[in-house]
């Protein structure tokens, strides 16, 4: 069953585009981009989520990330 979001596709796509533009502007290689994005996620969880909920949110995020990874060999 598809998940529904309270955010429009357009809003999500615009944020994604803006974030990608920043990484491209700084010519960030993949490893640096992943490190920065991971640090951003950690910061958001640690500063915006109640301590009792942080582990559950991190686990949910990790599962969502893993399920969205494409297993094809092309890159």
From Swiss-Prot:
Cysteine pairings via disulfide bonds: none
Protein name as it appears in the record: UPF0352 protein CKO_00587
Pfam family, one: DUF1414
InterPro entries recorded: UPF0352 (IPR009857), YejL_sf (IPR023202)
UniProt family annotation: Belongs to the UPF0352 family.
